[in-house]
Design a protein with these regions (language model features):
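N-terminal Rossmann-like dinucleotide-binding module
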Residues: 20-96, 176, 244
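Beta-strand-loop-alpha-helix segment that lines the small-molecule cofactor/substrate pocket
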Residues: 122-123, 127-175, 189
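Conserved SAM-binding strand-loop segment of SAM-dependent methyltransferases
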Residues: 100-104
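Predominantly a Rossmann-like dinucleotide-binding segment in NAD(P)-dependent oxidoreductases
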Residues: 58, 62, 162-169, 173-268, ...
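N-terminal Rossmann-like NAD(P) cofactor-binding module of classical short-chain dehydrogenase/reductase
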Residues: 117-118
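N-terminal secretory signal peptides
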Residues: 1-15
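Glycine-centered tight beta-turn/hairpin loop motif at sheet-sheet or coil-to-beta transitions
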Residues: 281-285
């Protein structure tokens, strides 16, 4: 399946608002997407006002993308925005001038006037903010990837299971109608057994953003450094590997791979080229490749 737009993001965001009890429907989608079990009634508490009161934590390009989408959802109200980088926070306030502003997400979470938060921060902040938000009694919609380390993912999973709150992660394909329909066909046996999976994602991009001063390099270009990023595997591959596991209806049992900095030799720490093979227990394999120095073959997910 080739994908060039992100309609699934908007659908996922709308489904998050639905899960808070503000929009009727969604039953058919729920039946075919079991990861949406976070919006079952036992995970919800009655909210006694007309709109879901949403706060944005992280208001860079991704956070502002969500702001624009939220403005199209009549049952959502942006009540607060938070960022510790002043230019991003100011841009968010220009988009939603009635929202309260914060530079410390912990202060935002103390507010009793917030039902849910949308987290669009660098990856290394996902786990602490998700955990703190659930502890504060907020519903959570978080950008991918779930977290930077496996231990952080496990901590989030355990905390969510002990909470009564909704938790979504923004994996676009999981909410995309094309992928949902395709998986229905695969799982029904219509096109036979899954015997192999191949995915690639090729781009021409250095991931580098301009910085106003050198001391902001690691803050603004966080995707390039290991303490804050998993590189191509967490920024791109996570989308496609999720599709593979969805198609196979299982998780791989082993993995081998390699990565290198082949082209962008500019001081970055994460690889700009990766090749990885995953193996399921039945011998079916995923062949995955990604690089950001040649976009000729674009992006594709193949279920064989």
């Amino acid at each position: 399946m080739k994908e060039h737009k992100e309609k699934g993001v908007d659908l996922g965001l709308r489904q998050f608002i639905k899960s808070l009890g503000y929009v009727a429907g969604g039953t058919a989608l729920l039946a075919t997407t079991p990861w949406l079990t976070s919006c079952t009634p036992e995970k919800l508490q009655e909210i006694k006002h007309e709109k879901a009161r949403i706060a944005l934590i992280g208001t860079g390009s991704r956070g502002q993308y969500h702001i624009h989408n939220l403005k199209e959802i009549p049952h959502a109200q942006i009540v607060a925005v938070c960022d510790n980088y002043a230019p991003n926070l100011q841009q968010a306030l220009e988009l939603c001038p009635d929202a309260k502003s914060y530079t410390d997400y912990r202060k935002l979470l103390e507010s009793k006037d917030i039902d849910g938060v949308i987290i669009s921060t660098p990856l290394n902040w996902h786990a602490p903010i998700v955990l703190d938000a659930l502890a504060a009694g907020k519903h959570v919609f978080c950008e991918k990837a779930m977290a930077r380390t496996l231990d952080e993912c496990k901590a989030i999973y355990d905390t969510y299971n002990q909470s009564d709150k909704v938790l979504y992660f923004c994996m676009q394909r999981m909410y995309d109608e094309k992928y949902i329909k395709g998986m229905q066909m695969i799982h029904s046996g219509l096109i036979g057994d899954v015997v192999g999976l191949r995915c690639h994602w090729f781009r021409n991009a250095d991931w580098r953003r301009p910085i106003p001063s050198p001391e902001l390099e690691r803050k603004i270009n966080w995707r390039l450094y290991k303490e804050s990023s998993g590189g191509l595997m967490t920024e791109l591959a996570c989308h496609q590997l999720e599709v593979c596991n969805w198609a196979a209806q299982k998780m791989p049992e082993s993995i081998m791979g390699m990565g290198d900095i082949v082209y962008w030799k500019d001081g970055r720490e994460v690889y700009d080229s990766v090749n990885v093979t995953y193996r399921y227990s039945d011998g079916v394999k995923i062949a995955y490749e990604s690089l950001i120095s040649n976009k000729f073959n674009g992006m594709e997910d193949q279920i064989l």
